[in-house]
């Protein structure tokens, strides 16, 4: 059962962990004989919050918080059955979210 392309999207709050996971996936795919397009860095989403430090007085004193979500995308072409099996056996770190789509 061969597919034309597999698209993998990875998300993480830690870019080092994300790059390590991408490297692991790329090495696994190349070892099975398939080719990889990417990793393509996607835009980083930033969420920011401003909170008052004191609830009653000193309105000018505020704290700023930010969370950054880093994203990468991989396209795997010329897929073999060994590629699919090896991708299913990879164990990624807990801080990485992965989304896999198969396209025909």
Curated annotation (Swiss-Prot):
Residue stretches spanning the membrane: none
Pfam entry (one): Ribosomal_S10
PROSITE patterns (UniProt xref): RIBOSOMAL_S10
A Gene Ontology molecular function term of the record: tRNA binding
One Gene Ontology CC term in the entry: ribonucleoprotein complex
UniProt keyword list: Ribonucleoprotein, Ribosomal protein
Subunit structure, as described in the record: Part of the 30S ribosomal subunit.
Protein name in the entry: Small ribosomal subunit protein uS10
Gene that encodes it: rpsJ
């Amino acid at each position: 059962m061969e597919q034309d392309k597999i698209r993998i999207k990875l998300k993480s709050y830690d870019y080092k962990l994300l790059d390590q996971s991408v490297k692991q996936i790329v090495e696994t795919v190349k070892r099975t004989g398939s080719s990889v397009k990417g990793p393509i860095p996607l835009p980083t989403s930033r969420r920011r919050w401003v909170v008052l430090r004191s609830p009653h007085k000193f309105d000018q004193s505020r704290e700023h918080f930010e969370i950054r979500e880093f994203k990468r995308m991989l396209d795997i072409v010329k897929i073999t059955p060994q590629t699919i099996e090896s991708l299913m056996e990879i164990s990624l770190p807990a801080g990485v979210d992965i989304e896999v789509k198969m396209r025909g």
